[in-house]
Regions:
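Extracytoplasmic small-molecule ligand-binding "clamshell" domains
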Residues: 31-94
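Pocket-lining segment of extracytoplasmic ligand-binding domains
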Residues: 125-126, 136-227
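Short loop->beta-strand "edge-of-pocket" segments that line small-molecule binding or catalytic clefts
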Residues: 34-39, 46, 131-148
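Short helices/loops that flank or line small-molecule/ion binding pockets
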Residues: 74-88, 101, 131, 172-187, ...
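Hydrophobic/proline-rich hinge and linker segments of small-molecule sensing/allosteric domains
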Residues: 106-129, 217-221
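N-terminal signal peptide c-region/cleavage motif recognized by signal peptidases
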Residues: 25-26
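Bacterial N-terminal signal peptides that target proteins for export
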Residues: 2-17
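An extracytoplasmic/periplasmic, membrane-proximal ligand-sensing/linker region
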Residues: 33-37, 41-52, 219-282
C-alpha cells in the first residue's frame, strides 16, 4: 500500500511538473503588448471597434494585445515620441517622423487604399469653391493631422487663400462643429466621415479633396520581439480570408490589410513637412 501511494504520488508530481513546464514555456513565448490607435474619433468609439479586433488578433497570434489611445492627437504624438506603444496605428506623417525619432518600423497598412483629405461644409452652405473660404475660421483635428489638416492647409496657402485654423482635437469634432454650424468648413478624411453619425453626416457636403497618399501605418517598436511582429503581421494579412476577421475589418472601413515597408511612405517624405519639428527637438 505504501509503495502504491509512493508510486501514485511520484506519477502525480511528474504530471504536475509536466504541465508547469508547459505553462511556463507558453508564458515565455506568449507576450503582452499595447497597440495605440491615433484618436481620430472618441476613445469610446475607437474602443468599440478596436477592442474586438485586438481580441481576435490575440487569439490568432497567441500573444496578448491591449487597446490604447489618447485624449487627443497632440497627446498621442507625445506618447509616440516616448515610445509608449509597442505597436501603433498612426497617420502617414506621424510615421515618417516617429520612424526616425522613436524607431517605429512599419509592417502593415490598409490594402489597396490611398488616404485622401477632404474639406467639408454644410450641405446648404453658399460656399462653392476653396476661394470662398478666404478669411474664414476652418476647423481641423490638430496641426499635424496629415490628410485632414496639413494637406488642406498647404493647398490653401499655395492658392493664396488665408484662413484661420481652429483645432478641435478629433475628426468627429470637426464634423460635429461643421454640421451644427459652429464653423463654416472643416478638414477630414473619407474613412472617418463615412463612420460619422449618419444623421449628422446628412448635413455635410464634400467641398474639395486632396490627391491620394500612402495610408496610415501599423508600426512596431524596433525593440519588439521580431517573431511577435511576424505573428501579428501574418494574422492581420489573413483577416480578410476569415469570416470573423472580415466583419471586424469592415467595422474600421477596411477590406483587407497588406504588408508594408518603410519606403512605402517616401511619397510623404517628399513633401518635407515640418509640423512636429518643435516637438522632436525638445
Amino acid at each position: 500500500m505504501t509503495s502504491y501511494i509512493r508510486t501514485f504520488t511520484l506519477n502525480h508530481l511528474r504530471h504536475i511538473t509536466f504541465w508547469l513546464v508547459l505553462l511556463f514555456s507558453w508564458q515565455s513565448w506568449a507576450e503582452s503588448y499595447v497597440l495605440g490607435v491615433v484618436p481620430q474619433q472618441s476613445a469610446r468609439k475607437l474602443a468599440q471597434v478596436w477592442v474586438p479586433i485586438l481580441a481576435y488578433l490575440s487569439k490568432k497570434t497567441g500573444d496578448s494585445y491591449s487597446f490604447a489611445t489618447a485624449t487627443d492627437i497632440p497627446t498621442f504624438e507625445q506618447r509616440l515620441l516616448e515610445g509608449a506603444y509597442d505597436v501603433a496605428y498612426m497617420n502617414p506623417y506621424h510615421y515618417v517622423v516617429f520612424e526616425e525619432a522613436s524607431d517605429y518600423q512599419a509592417f502593415a497598412k490598409q490594402a489597396d487604399k490611398e488616404i485622401v483629405g477632404l474639406i467639408v461644409v454644410d450641405k446648404l452652405s453658399q460656399i462653392a469653391e476653396l476661394d470662398d473660404l478666404n478669411n474664414l475660421d476652418v476647423a481641423f483635428p490638430s496641426p499635424a493631422a496629415f490628410a485632414s489638416s496639413m494637406l488642406p492647409r498647404a493647398e490653401l496657402k499655395r492658392r493664396g487663400i488665408t484662413i484661420h485654423p481652429r483645432y478641435v482635437l478629433s475628426h468627429d469634432s470637426v464634423y460635429l462643429n461643421v454640421a451644427r454650424g459652429f464653423f463654416p468648413a472643416g478638414g477630414g478624411i473619407g474613412r472617418t466621415l463615412n463612420n460619422f453619425n449618419p444623421e449628422l453626416k446628412e448635413n455635410l457636403r464634400v467641398l474639395w479633396k486632396t490627391k491620394g497618399y500612402t495610408p496610415h501605418a501599423f508600426a512596431a517598436k524596433a525593440s519588439m520581439n521580431e517573431e511577435a511582429v511576424k505573428r501579428l503581421q501574418h494574422a492581420m494579412l489573413e483577416m480578410h480570408d476569415d469570416p470573423e476577421g472580415e466583419i471586424l475589418l469592415r467595422e474600421i472601413g477596411f477590406k483587407a490589410i497588406s504588408a508594408a515597408e518603410n519606403s512605402d511612405w517616401d511619397d510623404v517624405r517628399a513633401l518635407q513637412l515640418n509640423a512636429l519639428d518643435e516637438l522632436i527637438q525638445h
